[in-house]
Design a protein with these regions (language model features):
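Short hydrophobic targeting helices and cationic amphipathic motifs
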Residues: 4-7
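Glycine-rich phosphate/diphosphate-binding loop of Rossmann-like nucleotide-binding domains
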Residues: 22-60
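Short glycine/serine/threonine-rich phosphate/pyrophosphate-binding segments
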Residues: 33-38, 62-65, 84-93
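Short, acidic/small-residue loops that bind anionic groups at enzyme active sites
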Residues: 97-110
Length: 110
């Protein structure tokens, strides 16, 4: 819990320092990942940080993923938090297409 609190504080400092206009993208590979990614939204809401959630699959909708990553900076995203189960390619694929920091979240496969 101490680590999470320090992370939360540092995360807010980074986001707020860059610009009040920036927001966070929370991207998941499928709706089944929403329960895990909801923890991210809780932290962001607690700090009053703007965010958008999106379901984009690196495997099922690669064109959509490519378009999202290529336009993320133009769309005022300062950080992307991406999570997916299985092979978890989503964070790496998005990261390869943008200069925006991407945080990968491992999600348990069922």
């Amino acid at each position: 819990m101490i680590f999470l609190s320090i992370f939360e504080i540092k995360f807010k400092q980074i986001i707020m320092k860059k610009s009040n206009n920036l927001k966070v993208a929370i991207v998941m590979g499928s709706q089944s990942d929403a329960k895990t990614m909801a923890l991210c939204t809780k932290v962001l809401k607690n700090f009053g940080i703007k965010f958008e959630t999106k379901i984009i699959s690196a495997h099922r909708t690669p064109k959509r993923m490519y378009e999202f990553a290529q336009t993320a900076e133009k769309n005022k995203f300062g950080v992307i938090i991406a999570g997916a189960g299985g092979s978890a390619h989503l964070p790496g694929m998005i990261s390869s297409l943008t200069s925006i920091p991407v945080l990968g979240v491992p999600i348990e496969s069922k």
